[in-house]
């Protein structure tokens, strides 16, 4: 699961890096946007590529030792891991029930990536425009490809906050801590981006 998680995160970073609109931003803005959205991009990739988010027994077994040490530091409360995995699985099921197609996943990733309210951005107006373009593309795609589902665009937008139901620190702890150890996720992302 850890190797798959690393691949999915790498794919998300590579996807963003290959977007011409993303590449046109300053390096600093690119890094800030990746730092702000990596967990959601990872989850969207995991959902799109059918990674079993709730690999219950396997995940709980393999994370048991890690979570016990995390519990001692107060990060996870007893039962919190199971609850977070349940939330992630519910999110996966919700996306699967809507049967999000590849074009919709791409638009949703762009909407998540181009978050103009992220602190420290040099050009938040341009980033907001890019997010608006992604929303327009998603709306047009939904309207043309799913004409009988008039509420589809709204439903897809309303599903995006589900990706933040479990915060990025917990996503990092659940899926990446064993492989990255104490290395800050920001450094991991920067290294992935540069390679």
Question: What residues fall within each predicted segment?
Answer:
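Nuclear receptor C-terminal ligand-binding domain
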Residues: 1-195
């Amino acid at each position: 699961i850890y190797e798959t998680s690393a691949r999915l995160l790498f794919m998300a970073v590579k996807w963003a890096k290959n977007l011409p609109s993303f590449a046109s931003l300053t390096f600093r803005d690119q890094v800030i946007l990746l730092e702000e959205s990596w967990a959601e991009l990872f989850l969207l990739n995991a959902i799109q590529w059918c990674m079993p988010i709730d690999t219950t027994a396997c995940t709980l077994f393999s994370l048991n030792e890690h979570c016990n040490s995390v519990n001692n530091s107060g990060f996870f409360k007893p039962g919190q891991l199971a609850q977070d995995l349940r939330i992630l699985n519910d999110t996966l099921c919700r996306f699967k029930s809507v049967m999000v197609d590849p074009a919709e996943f791409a638009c949703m990733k762009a909407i998540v990536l181009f978050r103009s309210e992220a602190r420290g951005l040099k050009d938040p107006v341009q980033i907001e425009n890019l997010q608006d373009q992604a929303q327009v593309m998603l709306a047009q795609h939904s309207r043309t490809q799913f004409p009988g589902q008039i509420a589809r665009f709204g439903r897809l937008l309303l599903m995006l906050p589900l990706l933040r139901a479990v915060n990025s620190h917990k996503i990092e702890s659940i899926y990446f801590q064993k492989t990255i150890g104490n290395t800050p996720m920001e450094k991991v992302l920067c290294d992935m981006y540069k390679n």
